[in-house]
Amino acid sequence: MAVSALMATLCWSATVATGFGALDTAKIESGTGLKGTWTEAEGVFKVTQPRNDVPVSVDGWTMPPFMGLTSWAAFSVGGTSEVMISGDLVLFEDEVNPVMSAALDAGLSVTALHNHFFFDQPRVYFMHLGGEGTLDKMAAGVKAALVRQKAVRAAQPQPGRVFGAGFAPAKNAVTGALVDDILGTKGQPNNGMFKIVIGREVKMPCGCMMTKEMGVNTWAAFAGTDDNAVVDGDFAVIEDELQPVLKSLRGSGINIVAIHHHMTHEQPRMLFLHYWGRGGVEPLTRSLKAALDVQKAVPPPSHDHAKA
């Protein structure tokens, strides 16, 4: 019994030794504000927070958090930094972009944004996080994201159903020349709307090139009027471009609505982030131009066939 008690104490001590170093689990809990569990076989300490503040139903059935509505962050000893983390935050639509900004500002990476269910009420999204750095910084980043999420719900207990920027005009009258002049593109008008497409290329396992017309592209579509417009679109980014482009778009107030992949086995690996913005055509276009400039400044990998 004495030996068992000693082993339990060692396994659950504030600083847990692993084959790769040590994790101060007490500091993780205090830094994130969450309680966690230690998985000795993997050298991972995981903190969790069930989303039980707002009831969620899927296909008419009330979902308990155990069935996939729990935010979490897992910490392990890093390779080149003190710790590495991964995580998944359960968010409602009006929480996504404020929380994303908080995570990015705190030094975390946002690696995916998508849904896990159909017919969920209210709609739930999942934001995947990653990062390497000091334990203090990574834990503080997780806490900052969760504090921001709670602030959104404190201000409005029930999840919002619109972005809140009002409605764009029913009749479209976008001056496409404004967009082309800023982006250096030649876009396509359509019934007062305007769309630009910027192609990229990836190589597939067959040795074939997948190109702009096959879906490897960045695009932006504008509707409304020059003073009151909506822009939606998609940025095609290689992995190293994702975080800089996200930071640029969020810094300009553009909403990110999805981050995922469209293909498998392509080279270089291409990710797609979908966005939605409101405002005047000129400031919206300048926001996109800033993100494109940030993207172009990222050095390409040696095997990059992409052309922005």
Stretch-by-stretch model annotation:
Residues F20-R123, G130-M270, W276-A308:
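Long, contiguous binding/interaction regions
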